[in-house]
Amino acid sequence: MKKKPFYKVLYVQVIFAIVVGVILGHYYPSLATEMKPLGDGFIKLIKMVIGPIIFCTVVTGIAGMEDMKKVGRVGGKALLYFEIVSTFALVLGLAATHILRPGVGFNIDPATLDGKAVASYAAKAHGQSTVDFLMHIIPNTMVDAFAQGEILQILLIALLFGSVLAHLGERGKVVTDFIDGLTRVLFGIVHIVTKLAPIGAFGAMAFTIGKYGVGSLVPLLKLIGTFYLTSVVFVLVVLGAIARFTGFSIIRFVSYIKEELLIVLGTSSSEAALPQLMEKLEKAGCSRSVVGLVVPTGYSFNLDGTNIYMTMAVLFIAQATNIELTWMQQLTLLAVAMLTSKGASGVTGAGFITLAATLAVVPTIPLSGMVLILGIDRFMSECRALTNIVGNGVATVVVSAWEKELDRAKLRQALKGGGEVAATETAGV
């Protein structure tokens, strides 16, 4: 098969678009901020099909299962994996901040901080209890779940729908075949929309640099560097060890999903690459049923980048305001963060709202301390989203392997470069 010219390869186009966006934002900030609709429009186009794709993928996957106990088994294994790896991420964020101490030396008096700038985030986080979170999973109506794009609500509907179809067997085959065909159409739409990724990445990056400016990074470069370094260590060491134990290379896996990662880098939203990630994982040998259950669930329960950010940001604020936290308080922080992080989604800004929810129940640290990192949160959200999507990809491969539903020949072929061939074959859809 003839290789495409490099300038026609999607990830090359996205890299170029990001660079152009940075240049425009730096030299022409007023014009760059006008590019925001390009990024927002691309994300909206992707989010338009996320709900239907999750519904169709989960329904067809469950409907094809002979043993309905498998649904609970896969879900249980996924949640167990999420909790273990999330704990590693939270502890790593805490440990890295203790070792590198990015907040030491600021000597900020908490009384001088104006909390008005973060009041809206605090308001959104207020009152989000575990019961509220669980009740929110149940939609008011089926239509409302799709209209609002609530992933967990759609997942619940799909689980019920797929379970009934599996119980009906041949009597429900017509509906199953229709949904399977609809899935192909939806992924065809994704392929078309993905071609617009460079435009979306350009608009989002130009707006970010134009509005906040590169200069806003300088005072807090140590915190940004600590967060990015810790995230890289988490991916290479923690996820790398998990990947090697499962039988694949984390470096090759990251290379395999590079297009999705660049889309996330440009838009700061891991949701922007959700449909493409699900398709890539199926092509890499993961079964559709496991992909359909693990990936959507992971977008609320397996946010590794957000977990690292949570403990790091809280401890940074404590260091910057010279507040000493006892080990018991830090253990409480870990427990609280384990719960509050489950309410975060893949949307830009969700991590900051989750941070507000965590600080609200750790009264030792002032909520107004969030002002210290408000200006750089947008630049840290890229790293959060990148780490989240890699973590969910690895989780899906691992759970597929646990279920003995991982085609290792397909996985080896994909990680050796077979994914590029598959992507080329579907480009004309």
Curated annotation (Swiss-Prot):
InterPro entries: C4_dicarb_transport, Na-dicarboxylate_symporter, Na-dicarboxylate_symporter_CS, Na:dicarbo_symporter_sf
Entry-linked Pfam families: SDF
GO CC terms in record: plasma membrane
Location of the protein in the cell: Cell inner membrane
Amino-acid biosynthesis among keywords: no
Signal peptide span: none
Kinase as UniProt keyword: no
GO molecular function: fumarate transmembrane transporter activity; malate:proton symporter activity; succinate transmembrane transporter activity
Biological process according to GO: L-aspartate transmembrane transport
Functional note: Responsible for the transport of dicarboxylates such as succinate, fumarate, and malate from the periplasm across the membrane.
Family recorded in the similarity comment: Belongs to the dicarboxylate/amino acid:cation symporter (DAACS) (TC 2.A.23) family.
PANTHER family named in the record: AEROBIC C4-DICARBOXYLATE TRANSPORT PROTEIN, PROTON/GLUTAMATE-ASPARTATE SYMPORTER
Protein name in UniProt: C4-dicarboxylate transport protein
Organism this protein belongs to: Burkholderia multivorans (strain ATCC 17616 / 249)
